[in-house]
Amino acid sequence: DKICIGHQSTNSTETVDTLTETGVPVTHAKELLHTEHNGKLCATNLGNPLILDTCTIEGLIYGNPSCDMLLGGREWSYIVERPSAVNGTCYPGNVENLEELRILFSSSSSYQRVQMFPDTIWNVTYSGTSKSCSDSFYRNMRWLTQKNGNYPVQDAQYTNTRGKNILFVWGIHHPPTDTAQTNLYTRTDTTTSITTESLDRTFKPLIGPRPLVNGLIGRINYYWSVLKPGQTLRVRSNGNLIAPWFGHVLSGESHGRILKTDLNSGNCVVQCQTEKGGLNSTLPFHNISKYAFGNCPKYIGVKSLKLAIGLRNVPARSSRGLFGAIAGFIEGGWPGLVAGWYGFQHSNDQGVGMAADRDSTQKAVDKITSKVNNIVDKMNKQYEIIDHEFSEIENRLNMINNKVDDQIQDIWAYNAELLVLLENQKTLDEHDANVNNLYNKVKRALGSNAMEDGKGCFELYHKCDDQCMETIRNGTYNRRKYMEESRL
């Protein structure tokens, strides 16, 4: 009678890489890299995105009349700005610290417009318009001009009693000629001051023609600040002021992301959103976009990252494992061994049989499960690559930022790949060791009652029915019971 120790083989085509080998065939492997997305803009755990369509964020904040659909308060988890959006500041001019403004606004999760200065507070004309703004003007600012040939000093105050920060905006008009200046403001030498407990700004117009933009050779320079709870804003001007009218009460925290994309909105909720689409995944890594946000796997820029779960599938003599078990004296796997990774095959007078060794298999499975969790834990240090916005004059800063981001991502990708290579090496060697240990366990139990054949089997010196074979498998074999028969 005969009993053999062996391991499983399958028709799997899975391969993994280790520190010393590439493309090692294995019975089972787990892909750790998520590679698919739904191609849509989805809600996240923080809520729905705010999709601006034809407007930019600054168009919303300053109140471009083409963005009237956004005048009501909104909430968002992230903001989507279309690449083709044209409705920003309609009257030509620059927004000071525009990138900071966009970050500040997008980091909140909601805004509510509140009136800061009623029209009755001004004793000049407050209904200035522009053809470049659809013969209208910004919904959050008033263009103050002379009334009946007079422009007395305007002096107004507003105290924030809302209990939350208020984002407010204003502008300074720079006419193209002295004539335009005096027609609007009666004098050429004007001064505007915008002050709070923490802000002190003074402005004078720079009169002169500029290149034609939107049919205009004048400019408005745009400004913004935040009025904290309890602070008072004081506005004093005798000309050229585009005065604050409505402010935005900013509340909450969002993902703080602005996606510039033409993706369609979907009826979906995802853990993780990117500019390419949303994804849900329980895997530790993804390769969709380095600008992913939400509850995301770690981004690494590789095509595949497979963790060995099972054994070597086609063991070869030349590829010996750490203990030599699988690749050595046990020549090939058993396709019929389906209930476990390791097991026994026997032949006796009752026929042949095969059985998995559930104990050693379960211990190996537990170890593999722990291994996957450990990889997740080791890579669980939070890092996010954010698509920061820089102005055109900050190209060097932008280049440095991108270089640092790329290096961080490269380091994480290297760490992940190295960790998986190490674990794959250990897994395959541990499988070798497990088969070897099972073999030695049987060898110790049988002692002199059997002879090794050098191929992973034992020729028994006594008759061994199925019940006897089961005692060898489960570790209850009584060597003394068969010792006398074995000597014959």
Give the predicted meaning of each segment.
Residues 6, 14-133, 137-155, 159, ...:
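Membrane-inserting hydrophobic helices used for pore formation or membrane fusion
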Residues 9, 15, 175, 179-204, ...:
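Long, low-complexity intrinsically disordered regions of secretory-pathway proteins
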Residues 59, 94, 270-272, 324:
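Generic short alpha-helical hydrophobic face used as a protein-protein interaction/packing hotspot
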Residues 261, 268-315:
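Function-dense linear segments that define catalytic or interfacial modules
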Residues 303-333:
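Membrane-penetrating hydrophobic segments
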Residues 328-442, 449:
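Heptad-repeat coiled-coil amphipathic alpha-helices that mediate oligomerization/assembly
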